[in-house]
């Protein structure tokens, strides 16, 4: 039996690749001790934390109706005024209601909906990264929810994950109110898209930390350049910021504990990818874990 902590990078729909890597490691008897993730990586980490296995997570990710999550192709057909109104009034184009309810149902199937259900002595083995853009700070959930007058153990896992996946401008942010003030919580990728550091200690660790990261492998440069409206441009800028944030800070010691998986040129918000592409991402993840 192998023991390790697992950290998953954000990456939107590309995170399907992680399920392939997980399945390969499970064949070796991997037992996850602590888990952490940002954005879509937070979804994967949360599913593992409540007891799902790799094959189950793959099915859940494939069954998710991504058209209800955010149809970027359809939004391009909307009048600019309609898209702009969503940004002005709600601070985002798409609602996170569907994805939050979907996650809640999946966690409920395992009987573990709150952090207290997966914690021991008030210590959660799951850490979710989010960003408070109002107060300009990184959040590690559930711990940092105390800053908003809430009990970390009573926090819904689905709510924490929803905070982490709320890509600025694309999704409406989660609003937290405390002492008469309101804070907007968005995608953790703004502050740390690959929190490989989160379980590091000064002394020798009890077990290793393995990171799961997505790389483009240059495929994005082969994409057809098309005319973009202003809203699509904003989404692209945010995606670029999130995808590249931690890249320049990845140290050599982090690279050797990271399974880097090609993303096949798939974009973070490309929710309409085919089942065939999802299978290719899964295969890439499986093969890269096999080489690790």
What positions do the PLM features span?
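Patatin-like phospholipase
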Residues: 1-38, 46-292
């Amino acid at each position: 039996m192998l023991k390790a902590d697992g950290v998953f990078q954000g990456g939107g729909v590309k995170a399907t690749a992680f399920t392939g890597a997980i399945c390969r490691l499970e064949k070796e008897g991997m037992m996850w001790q602590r888990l952490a993730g940002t954005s879509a990586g937070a979804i994967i980490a949360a599913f593992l934390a409540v007891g799902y296995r790799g094959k189950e997570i793959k099915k859940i990710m494939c069954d998710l109706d991504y058209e209800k999550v955010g149809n970027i192709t359809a939004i391009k057909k909307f009048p600019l005024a309609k898209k702009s109104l969503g940004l002005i009034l709600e601070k985002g184009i798409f609602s996170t209601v569907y994805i939050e309810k979907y996650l809640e149902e999946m966690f409920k199937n395992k009987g573990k909906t709150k952090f207290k259900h997966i914690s021991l002595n008030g210590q959660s083995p799951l850490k979710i990264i989010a960003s408070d853009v109002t107060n300009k700070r990184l959040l590690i959930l559930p711990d940092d929810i105390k800053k908003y007058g809430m009990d970390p153990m009573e926090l819904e896992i689905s709510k924490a994950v929803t905070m982490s996946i709320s890509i600025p401008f694309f999704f409406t942010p989660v609003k937290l109110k405390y002492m008469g003030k309101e804070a907007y919580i968005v995608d953790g990728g703004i502050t740390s898209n690959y929190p490989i550091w989160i379980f590091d200690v000064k002394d020798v660790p009890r077990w290793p930390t393995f990171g799961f990261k997505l790389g483009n492998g240059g495929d994005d440069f082969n994409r057809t350049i098309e005319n973009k409206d202003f809203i699509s441009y904003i989404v692209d800028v945010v995606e670029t910021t999130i995808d590249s944030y931690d890249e320049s800070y990845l140290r050599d010691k982090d690279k050797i504990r990271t399974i880097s998986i090609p993303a096949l040129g798939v974009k973070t918000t490309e929710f309409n990818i085919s089942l065939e592409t999802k299978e290719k991402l899964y295969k890439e993840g499986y093969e890269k874990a096999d080489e690790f």
